[in-house]
Amino acid sequence: MPSKKVIKKKVAAVPAHIRAQTQVQKEVKNPLFEKRARNFNIGQDIQPKKDVTRFVKWPKYIRLQRQSAILQKRLKVPPTINQFRTALDSQSARQAFKLLDKYRPESTEAKKNRLRARAEARAAGKKEEVTKRPNTVRHGVNTITRLVETRRAQLVLIAHDVNPLEIVLHLPALCRKYNVPYAIIKGKASLGTVVRRKTTAAVALVDVNPEDKSALNKLVETVNNNFSERHEEIRKHWGGGVMSAKSDAKKLKIERARARDLGKL
């Protein structure tokens, strides 16, 4: 069955004389309301709606975080401290964590079961087998310092956000002194998950299984290229010294005024 043809009706145009009247008519304003320019300075007109996040009274711990972040931008940061702002790239970090996860320390439950089985075997009068300590990730600043000084550590990973930083400040220089590969990695919490803790300042690998030797060698090569071999460059690189827009504008204003005065002389 053929569809019905829809006929659209055209609306008649507005006559010319009426159109002219509508264009001529202007909005009638009340003369009692005077038009004046607004002044948004302090203590003057009501401010327009805007983002007032900057003026929020934050809790004390957040306020300290914000102040610390701003101070680190403003003040000149020595290279020894500034090196902790440059962390290992994400791809290499993923490879490092993939390797570390194979050598996580045993959980509390696993340790309990192992000791229970050992106690039962001893009670049954079976001969006790002396087994070698399995290769695991070592953590704790004192432990890692000792491993580096005895040249037993094969790879050291240091967290970039340790607070206070003085805890791990000596580790990069110590690792370079004893030719131990080291890397600064993002997140003390990420390192903490490896050793089943909330956070940890640094971790170290002492030895790995034969099947993981090649993975460790590749990782050590990447780490050395990024940190140990770039030591001279890192040593010269200061941080901070970035001023706010307000300070920059003030400085520019003073410089322009000085240039104007010199021009007059």
Swiss-Prot record:
The keyword Nucleotide-binding does not apply. GO terms for biological process: maturation of LSU-rRNA. Pfam families: Ribosomal_L7Ae (PF01248). Disulfide bonds: none annotated. One of its GO terms (cellular component) is cytosolic large ribosomal subunit. The keyword Ribonucleoprotein applies. Keywords: Calmodulin-binding, Ribonucleoprotein, Ribosomal protein. GO terms for molecular function: calmodulin binding; RNA binding. Belongs to the eukaryotic ribosomal protein eL8 family. Interacts with cmd-1 in the presence of Ca(2+). This is Large ribosomal subunit protein eL8. The lineage of its organism: Eukaryota, Metazoa, Ecdysozoa, Nematoda, Chromadorea.
